[in-house]
Design a protein with these regions (language model features):
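Transmembrane-helix boundary motif in ABC transporter permease subunits
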Residues: 72-102
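Generic hydrophobic transmembrane alpha-helix motif, especially the helices
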Residues: 103-139, 146-147
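Transmembrane alpha-helices
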Residues: 130, 134, 166-200, 231, ...
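Short helix-to-coil transition segments within interhelical loops
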Residues: 148-154, 158-178
Length: 270
């Protein structure tokens, strides 16, 4: 069975690669028809700008600055969400606290808090971390709490019947059963945080010290280097695809798919 698994992976990547090539061809044709590189650079011009930025070290430096802030804020947001979820699972008052806070803050766009963050923490890393923690914490807390709440009572009883209790019951039964919902919350939190970070650097000019990817796009727009703007956008998309494909899909494949808790899509990598 294992020997057959490279086939679906190869075919899936082939289909996606062909789709990307088709989109790039349409982009190139539209840019040539528009014939205005200031408004719409071609795919080839963007590729050259992207390659030049990578080879010069300019783009990797901006990417590293953005990811450093994102990883720090993401870790803090995950920790805060787990604390809130633990309180909600442990007592009625904790549940009321989680429900009240998520009802208040989950619908609130993180970027709307940035003006306050700039007043409180100034123009720098702390303001970005504050709004990114807000982006991560509430969707993850909601999904984690829903995941733990949906664990069937029969599954808990089965764990107790084989001698599991306390921490062993939590780690061997509860967390694996709630993991699909928790992974969904982690992915939603990542997506919210990533786009909030780029928007904050782009719209408000907020930087993490040496500037991030959004700042690179902002500066390129000011200097009318539209090809570099598109190169920065391509970097944003590429990082999103890499995190989704290499991190989250790998975790899903090694956990919930292997355990039979999530159905594998036809043609997806096994």
């Amino acid at each position: 069975v294992r020997a057959d698994r490279p086939g679906p992976l190869r075919h899936a990547w082939l289909r996606k690669s062909l789709l990307l090539l088709l989109l790039a061809g349409l982009w190139e044709a539209l840019a040539r028809w528009q014939d205005n590189a200031l408004l719409l650079p071609s795919a080839l011009q963007t590729a050259r700008a992207f390659a030049a930025g990578m080879l010069s070290g300019e783009l990797p430096g901006y990417v590293a600055a953005s990811l450093a802030v994102l990883v720090q804020a993401y870790a803090l947001g995950v920790a805060g969400a787990l604390v809130l979820t633990s309180l909600a699972l442990g007592s009625r008052s904790g549940r009321d606290l989680l429900e009240t806070l998520t009802a208040m803050f989950n619908p609130l766009p993180a970027i709307a808090l940035l003006p306050l963050a700039l007043l409180w923490f100034g123009l720098g890393r702390a303001s970005l971390v504050f709004v990114l923690v807000h982006s991560v914490m509430w969707p993850l807390a909601l999904n984690a709490y829903a995941g733990f709440g949906s664990v069937p009572e029969t599954l808990r009883m089965a764990g107790r019947n084989v001698g599991l209790n306390g921490a062993r019951l939590v780690f061997q039964v509860m967390i694996p059963a709630a993991l699909p919902a928790m992974l969904s919350g982690l992915k939603i939190g990542w997506a919210f945080a990533w786009r909030t970070l780029i928007a904050a650097e782009l719209v408000f000019g907020t930087t993490s010290g040496q500037g991030g990817l959004g700042w690179y796009i902002f500066q390129s727009r000011n200097e009318l280097f539209t090809d570099k703007v598109f190169a920065g956008l391509a970097a944003v998309i590429a990082i999103g695809l890499l995190v989704e494909g290499l991190v989250f899909q790998t975790v899903e494949r090694l956990t919930v798919r292997r355990w039979g808790m999530q159905r594998q899509a036809p043609g997806s990598p096994g």
